[in-house]
C-alpha cells in the first residue's frame, strides 16, 4: 500500500509553492507583518484563489473541484513553508467540510455558490 501523495496532489502542491516562492518572499511577508501594504496581501490572496485552492473541497456538482482532504493538507504544507499570511484553513477547508457534511441540498447550493 502506498502512503505518499499522488502525482496530482504533488502537482497542486508544487504550483502553490512556486507561486508563493515567486510572489511572497520573506521581505514581502515582513512588510505585511509590519502592517503595511494591505494591497500586497490582497494580491497574494487573489493569486491563491486563481490557483483554485478556494474550490478544492467543494463538490463538483456545486462548482468546485471535488478533491479530498489530502489535497488540502498538501496545500497547507506549501502555505506553512512560506509563512503565508493568508486565510486558508477556516474558509477553504473547515467551512466547505462543514457545509458538505452538515447542510441540506438547498443550503449547499446557496453557500457553495458564494464561495
Model-derived regions, located:
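Conserved "HGTGT" condensation-loop signature of ketosynthase/thiolase-family condensing enzymes
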Residues: 14
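Glycine-rich flavin
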Residues: 24-115
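Intrinsic disorder at enzyme termini
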Residues: 1-8
Amino acid at each position: 500500500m502506498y502512503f505518499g501523495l499522488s502525482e496530482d496532489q504533488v502537482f497542486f502542491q508544487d504550483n502553490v509553492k512556486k507561486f508563493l516562492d515567486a510572489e511572497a518572499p520573506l521581505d514581502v511577508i515582513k512588510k505585511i507583518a509590519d502592517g503595511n501594504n494591505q494591497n500586497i496581501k490582497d494580491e497574494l490572496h487573489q493569486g491563491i484563489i486563481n490557483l483554485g485552492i478556494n474550490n478544492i473541497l467543494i463538490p463538483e456538482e456545486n462548482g468546485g473541484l471535488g478533491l479530498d482532504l489530502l489535497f488540502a493538507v498538501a496545500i497547507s504544507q506549501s502555505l506553512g513553508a512560506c509563512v503565508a499570511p493568508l486565510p486558508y484553513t477556516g474558509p477553504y477547508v473547515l467551512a466547505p467540510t462543514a457545509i458538505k457534511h452538515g447542510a441540506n441540498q438547498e443550503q449547499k447550493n446557496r453557500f457553495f455558490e458564494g464561495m
